[in-house]
């Protein structure tokens, strides 16, 4: 979610400034968030993946207000931060351009809006997406985490409905 890098940085500063507060209270750690996110992404590897599990974070680029967050997470997770122009689809397979040649991409952690991810499937005027990536996703050759259409789950307007729905679901379990 947006803002997690600031939370991690803030916590680190707070721990340095007020160590006694963290020693006396049972405050849950947050510094392991990037590792948890990475493991979650790895668990969502498509069946047709390479042995290496190549994960990338797809960002709109440095002019985006959340770019610091994207680069922070990529650095902390040890994955590549890419823009749409760094990726391409060939015969249904998503690849990343590198100085060593192309590398197959297995998982894309999407940080761009739905309409911009694939100019063939969505907004044809998008200059920041990857042409053909949605078909690659539908074919099971790449997994797009934070899949197109899933943004509604993070819409604050439905949080109260979500809470009620989750509580009802827990009761059924």
Label each PLM-derived region with a short phrase.
Residues 1-129, 135-138, 143:
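ATP-dependent carboxylate activation and anion-phosphoryl transfer catalytic cores
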Residues 9, 162-163:
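Short, charged/polar low-complexity linear motifs in solvent-exposed/disordered segments
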Residues 69, 154, 158:
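Catalytic-loop motifs flanking and including active-site residues across diverse enzymes
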Residues 132-154, 162:
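Ser/Thr/Gly-rich flexible loops in soluble cytosolic domains mediating phosphotransfer, phosphorylation
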Residues 158-159, 166:
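Short, intrinsically disordered, charge-balanced linker/junction segments flanking boundaries
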Residues 165-173:
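Single conserved hydrophobic/aromatic residue that forms the stacking wall/gate
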């Amino acid at each position: 979610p947006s803002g997690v890098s600031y939370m991690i940085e803030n916590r680190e500063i707070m721990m340095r400034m007020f160590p006694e507060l963290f020693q006396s209270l049972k405050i849950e750690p947050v510094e392991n968030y990037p590792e948890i996110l990475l493991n979650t992404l790895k668990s969502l590897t498509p069946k047709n993946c390479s042995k290496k599990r190549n994960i990338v974070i797809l960002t709109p680029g440095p002019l985006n207000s959340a770019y610091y967050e994207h680069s922070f997470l990529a650095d902390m997770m040890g994955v590549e931060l890419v823009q749409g122009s760094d990726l391409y689809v060939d015969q249904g397979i998503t690849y990343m351009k590198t100085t060593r040649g192309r590398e197959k991409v297995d998982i894309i952690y999407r940080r761009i809006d739905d309409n911009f991810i694939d100019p063939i499937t969505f907004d044809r005027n998008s200059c920041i997406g990857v042409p053909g990536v949605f078909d690659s996703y539908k074919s099971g050759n790449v997994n797009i985490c934070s899949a197109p259409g899933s943004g509604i789950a993070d819409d604050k307007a439905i949080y109260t409905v979500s809470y009620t729905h989750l509580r009802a679901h827990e009761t059924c379990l």
